[in-house]
A protein has these predicted regions:
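Long hydrophobic alpha-helical segments that form multi-pass transmembrane helix bundles
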Residues: 1-3
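Outer-membrane beta-barrel pore domains
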Residues: 6-158
Length: 158
């Protein structure tokens, strides 16, 4: 849905099934040939190619087998940026929660600062710095409460 210029509202819902696979060292997720999986995502974007860029999304995924959650995850982000000539600097907050595997790095809040530079139409360079913060269960499992990430990328369209 596009109620006004540059603004989009989107959503998706997936209902389906997946199969468990035998993995080296044990069984896969679930309990049989067909395990239910539901997923939805909703989001809103405002992207003026000569100015403000705002985005937000929320997603949820769940699979329950024999009254037990085998997948129960939430994710969200909010992004703000400004198109400034060939540059697009941004700041972003995102989070992910895994309610089944609570002691893993899948449970975080992150603040990201980045910038994309459009070299020309089909080539962009991007640099991002992310600071991850982990909840109590993840801290216990990981042995640390935060981590850093530096990402440098080239994006090419052919």
């Amino acid at each position: 849905v596009r109620p006004v210029k540059y603004f989009n509202i989107k959503g998706t819902f997936n209902w389906g099934e997946y199969t468990s696979k035998k993995l080296e060292g044990g069984e896969g997720v679930g309990s049989g040939d067909y395990n239910p999986m539901n997923r939805y995502v909703v989001g809103a974007w405002y992207d003026n190619p000569r100015g403000l860029n705002l985005r937000a999304e929320y997603g949820h995924m769940k699979s329950r087998v024999n009254k037990t959650d085998v997948v129960k995850e939430n994710g969200a982000y909010v992004l703000a940026g400004w198109h400034w000539g060939k540059f697009l600097p941004i700041v972003r907050w995102d989070m992910y929660e895994d309610h089944v595997n609570t002691g893993t790095a899948n449970n975080y809040n992150r603040i990201l600062i980045g910038c994309t530079y459009s070299v020309f139409k089909n080539m962009k360079l991007q640099v991002n710095y992310g600071h991850f913060m982990y909840g109590d269960d993840a801290r216990k499992g990981l042995g640390y409460d935060s981590s850093e990430q530096l990402q440098i990328m080239g994006l090419f369209k052919f």
